[in-house]
């Protein structure tokens, strides 16, 4: 896909594929992400459910559309400000992240699946602690997959429908149990806010699942990148701070995002009408030759590194500080304990938006 990105940046940086406008250059992608007045995140009405049903797919309306991800100001600002303090770097549970990381690593043998044994449980256990919920890793992962993918084959409708109902029931139960009580966790803060019930459910579900899916991808991608590009010694000597940023740029957990135009706009030589969908290819922007020197090389100490993997503008990822913290500690502790001898098996996620591994089996020796 990266060869296609390079070709499109050169030949058709603003490209209409018959349904959606696609942007490939860093400058254009960042401009759209920063301009919420002309490029909206509110995509209500743009999910063609009939087409999905005809193609043997089933769509479930999960209340995550009632969140800061899919809203514009002033609602967006109200939603974001509700929990912003909890994701301030100075308020993050650093000691707990390290404690969980060390425990998970201590349980691993000489050959293991990085994703299942480490990259999945770590962010789920951390966000569960912050939300004040029982950390059921398997259930939260199942729900995360359901919301992240949002599509299921028609022959899976009953199992997917059951998971969906479990997710909604769980969110309502947790929120209801905290209404009118002292606020001691993020769930309590949401439950006792002035948001509508749908907004509360959407907010709770977003916090529970949004970060863990992308952080899992980040950790898995970074372990592969550090192994393939011989970066583990750098991490042991200098720490993982800059190397995590390079993993975010080189192998972004999310390949692209989407906006809808609120008025007629012109990008380069292309005029885009109001109400058109615009696909922002973050993965392509992160390899733009005009911004990044030697963009197709993995350089663990790359400076500066203005990648767009956490977005930009008002929708800059709220959980970015937490994801960075989890990834940095995870990779530094991993480097202290192990040396990767071989990547035994890997299986990519089959998804146009999410970029990561379903399975990443490594063979290691003690460092």
Curated annotation (Swiss-Prot):
Binding site for heme: 76, 80, 257, 259, 315, 317
Record flagged with keyword Oxidoreductase: yes
Cofactor binding notes: Binds 1 heme group per subunit.
Keyword Protein biosynthesis: no
Short name of any one Pfam family annotated for the protein: p450
Enzyme Commission no: 1.14.-.-
Domain of life: Archaea
One Gene Ontology CC term in the entry: cytoplasm
Compartments reported by the entry: Cytoplasm
Temperature dependence: Active up to 80 degrees Celsius. Thermostable.
Cofactors named for this entry: heme
Keywords annotated in UniProt: Cytoplasm, Heme, Iron, Metal-binding, Monooxygenase, Oxidoreductase
Molecular-function annotations in GO: heme binding; iron ion binding; monooxygenase activity; oxidoreductase activity, acting on paired donors, with incorporation or reduction of molecular oxygen
SUPFAM superfamilies for the chain: Cytochrome P450
PANTHER family reported for this sequence: CYTOCHROME P450 YJIB-RELATED (PTHR46696:SF1), P450, PUTATIVE (EUROFUNG)-RELATED (PTHR46696)
Xref: NCBIfam families: Cyp119_Thmprot
Family: Belongs to the cytochrome P450 family.
Protein name: Cytochrome P450 119
Source organism per UniProt: Sulfurisphaera tokodaii (strain DSM 16993 / JCM 10545 / NBRC 100140 / 7) (Sulfolobus tokodaii)
Underlying gene: cyp119
């Amino acid at each position: 896909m990266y060869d296609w990105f390079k070709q499109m940046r050169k030949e058709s940086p603003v490209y209409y594929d018959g349904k959606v406008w696609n942007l490939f250059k860093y400058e254009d992608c960042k401009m759209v992400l920063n301009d919420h007045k002309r490029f909206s995140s509110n995509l209500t009405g743009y999910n063609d459910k009939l087409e999905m049903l005809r193609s043997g797919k089933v769509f479930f309306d999960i209340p995550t559309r009632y969140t800061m991800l899919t809203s514009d100001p002033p609602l967006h600002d109200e939603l974001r400000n509700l929990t912003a303090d909890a994701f301030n770097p100075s308020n993050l549970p650093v000691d707990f992240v390290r404690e969980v990381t060390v425990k998970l690593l201590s349980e691993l043998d000489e050959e293991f699946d990085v994703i299942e044994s480490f990259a999945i449980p770590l962010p789920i256990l951390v966000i569960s602690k912050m939300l004040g919920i029982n950390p059921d890793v398997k259930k939260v992962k199942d729900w995360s997959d359901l919301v992240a993918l949002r599509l299921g084959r028609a022959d899976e409708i009953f199992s997917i429908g059951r998971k969906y109902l479990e997710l909604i029931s769980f969110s309502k139960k947790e929120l209801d149990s905290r209404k009118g009580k002292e606020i001691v966790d993020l769930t309590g803060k949401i439950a006792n806010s002035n948001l509508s019930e749908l907004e509360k459910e959407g907010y709770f579900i977003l916090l529970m699942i949004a970060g863990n899916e992308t952080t899992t991808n980040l950790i898995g991608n970074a372990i592969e990148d550090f192994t393939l590009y011989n970066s583990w010694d750098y991490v042991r000597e200098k720490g993982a701070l800059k190397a995590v940023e390079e993993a975010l740029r080189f192998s972004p957990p999310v390949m692209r995002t989407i906006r809808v135009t609120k008025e007629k706009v012109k990008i380069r030589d292309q005029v885009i009408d109001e109400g058109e969908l615009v696909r922002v290819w973050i993965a392509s922007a992160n390899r733009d030759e005009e911004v990044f020197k030697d963009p197709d090389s993995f350089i663990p100490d790359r400076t500066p590194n203005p990648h767009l993997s956490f977005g930009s503008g008002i929708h800059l990822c709220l959980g970015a500080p937490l994801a960075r913290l989890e990834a940095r500690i995870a990779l530094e502790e991993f480097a202290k304990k192990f040396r990767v001898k071989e990547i035994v098996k890997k299986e990519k996620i089959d998804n146009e938006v999410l970029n990561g591994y379903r399975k990443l089996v490594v063979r290691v020796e003690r460092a």
